[in-house]
Structure formats: structure tokens, C-alpha cells
Amino acid sequence: MRYYTQVVAASLVATLAVVDSIVFADRGNKLRFLRQDGATVTRGGKGEERTGTAGSVESLTNLANLYFDSNLSSRVIKKMLEEHDGHQPVLAMIEKRFQERGAQKYMYLDEGLVTRETAEKKFIEWILEGKTKKQVKKEFGISSEPGNESAVELQESAIKAYGDWLEDLNGRSWDLENTAASKAFAYLYGKHVSRDWILGMFKAWATEGTPLKVAKNHLFKEPMRPFDMFQEENFVAYVTYAKMLREKIKSISPPRRDPVPTASN
């Protein structure tokens, strides 16, 4: 399931009295939102201001919860809420929900049972390392034993979620490489840049051995939750550089030589 494009299912849409579909531009990424009747929005062209007032805190709360349950990131929900007057208490409520979700016990790692946010931070690391779902399952899968059913179920759910992240990332990468490669592969220095342009920069970085942390600081201007980072439009570029850097390091590493068997061993 693709998180960044996920739109509320028909059964959830029915919870809204009247639905008006609008498009909110997030640095070139078109994200489709739904709003309940009672909210008014002034729409403008590129570069124009948009303002809005919510009919009630209740309707805005319903929308925020709807987006939260639809796996939209906290940054996207915040941008939506900030278009409406009286959004502060709703924003505080949603922030609390994100904190509670991030604190849920989610997965067993080397250090034991960890929270969702800790596990998702690990998801980011695995993606940058190029780990497949199969590799993660081999490393962190829990064997089924009597009395161990709940742990197995929890672990399988987390590993499946990692697989969903990979599936989503592959879809986004394909879209950028095949539909927006010429103009909007990433957002840097206040503008969208092409895939060819950024690959040229990445090639120079990889040749110089520029650390991944430097690329991260260029692509993401502020700290954010792992899930929010994953949904950022620059994440595909981040993963692209990580892959280029891995390949460069591999190409200059001396070949592995197994020890020559001797009589003593």
C-alpha cells in the first residue's frame, strides 16, 4: 500500500457530511485531501496565498483524525490544519496521538522489544543499507514455539510493515524516474531539480566519499520522525545517494580473499 498517496476509503468518506476534494501542493507533491462542509477555503494559483476557516473544532478534529488513520504524516496533517483558524487544540491532539503511536511496543530487535518509532528508525537504516524484507525476516524473525504466539504475530506484523515501506518506495522511485525525471526528482536550494542534475551532484559526492550524513543535511533541513522522513519527497533521492555511495565503496574495497588451506587447518 502506498502511504504517500493513500486516500480515505469509501467507508471512511461516508463519515463526512459533504466532501469537497481539494489539492494541496507540498513542494510539488500533489496530495489529495478531503474536507467537511463548513470549512471554507480560498484557492489561488501558483504563488498565491490560501486561507481558510473551519466551521468548528469538531469538524477539523474529524478531518485530522481521518488523515491520521489514513497514515498521512504529521507534517502533512500540520500543514492542512494550519490553513484553518482555531487549529491549535486540534494540532495538539494530533501531536499527542502521534506520540502515543510512536510509543507503542512494536518489534523485537537486538535490544529487546522496542517502540514503533524506534523500529521505524531502524526501517530507515535498513533501507539505506539496501536490506530486503527477506533479509530482515531472516535476521529478526521469531520461531514459532508454544506460548510464543503473540511475539511471533507482533514480529511478523512489523516485518510486513517494512515490506510495505519497500513496496511504497519502489513505486515512488519508479514514478520519479519515469514521469518526473526531467524536472522534479528532488527539492533543493528552493527549487525542484531534475534527476540528471542531482545524479551528477551525487556522483561527485560519492567520488569524494561524502558521508551520507552530509547528504541528509542537504536533503532534510530539520529533524523529523522516521515516518515523516520516509514520506518526504526528497527521501527517494536520499536512498539513491545511499545506493551510489555503497556501490562506490564496494568498487574501491580490496577483494575478499579466503585463507589458503594448509595442513594445520
From Swiss-Prot:
GO CC annotations on file: extracellular region; host cell cytoplasm; host cell nucleus
Glycan attachment residues as annotated in the record: N71, N148
Motif mapping: RxLR-dEER: 32-50
Keywords from the UniProt entry: Glycoprotein, Host cytoplasm, Host nucleus, Secreted, Signal, Virulence
UniProt key word Glycoprotein: yes
Domain of life: Eukaryota
Subcellular location: Secreted; Host nucleus; Host cytoplasm
Signal peptide annotation: 1-25
Domain notes from UniProt: The RxLR-dEER motif acts to carry the protein into the host cell cytoplasm through binding to cell surface phosphatidylinositol-3-phosphate.
Family, similarity comment: Belongs to the RxLR effector family.
Physiological role: Secreted effector that completely suppresses the host cell death induced by cell death-inducing proteins.
Name of the protein in its database record: Secreted RxLR effector protein 146
Naturally occurring in which organism (per UniProt): Plasmopara viticola
